[in-house]
Amino acid sequence: LADTHPAASWLPVDPSARAQAIRGLVFIAANCYPMITIIDYPERFVSDLGDDEALQKRVRAGTRKTLHRHWEMFADLFPARPFLNGEHIGALDLYAAVVSKWSGTRAHVAAARPAFDAVLQRIEADPRVAAIFAQHWPPK
């Protein structure tokens, strides 16, 4: 998508910054998104889970803890400049902003990595992003 529509600036032009953004996209896809799937569907990953509510709760809690640890690592590895993509919002910013909305991540990073939480809030505050997010996550 970034190569087909370079004017959209989905990824940075600088090769080093571009590689870092791609690394960030892969990090979220490989480390965060799978944890959300386990939290949402633990029965797909634990064969004996059945209707055992206590076990389901433990699987979800342990997986959520791992997910939040992964977001802490992400925050430490991918600093904003002022956005994750660099000077303007790009693919990594949007992906991080969306995936971090699930499984209690925002509350966790607000406490554990407030600077990263501020980046996510900056991304969400962009009028283009805010309009889309309002459709999927209406203000409370």
Question: Where are the language model's segments positioned?
Answer:
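Active-site rim elements
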Residues: 57-64, 83, 106-109
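All-alpha amphipathic helical-bundle segments outside canonical DNA-binding/catalytic cores
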Residues: 10-20, 62, 80-92
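Residue-level signal for nonpolar/aromatic packing positions in well-ordered secondary structure
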Residues: 21, 74, 93, 123-129
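Extended, well-ordered alpha-helical scaffold segments
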Residues: 62-66, 112-125, 129
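GST superfamily/GST-like fold recognition
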Residues: 31, 36-40, 84-109, 122-123
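Amphipathic alpha-helical packing segments from all-alpha helical-bundle domains
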Residues: 59-78
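GST-like domain detector, emphasizing the conserved glutathione-binding G-site
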Residues: 1-58
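Surface-exposed helix-capping loop/turn segments at secondary-structure junctions
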Residues: 7, 76-87, 128-133
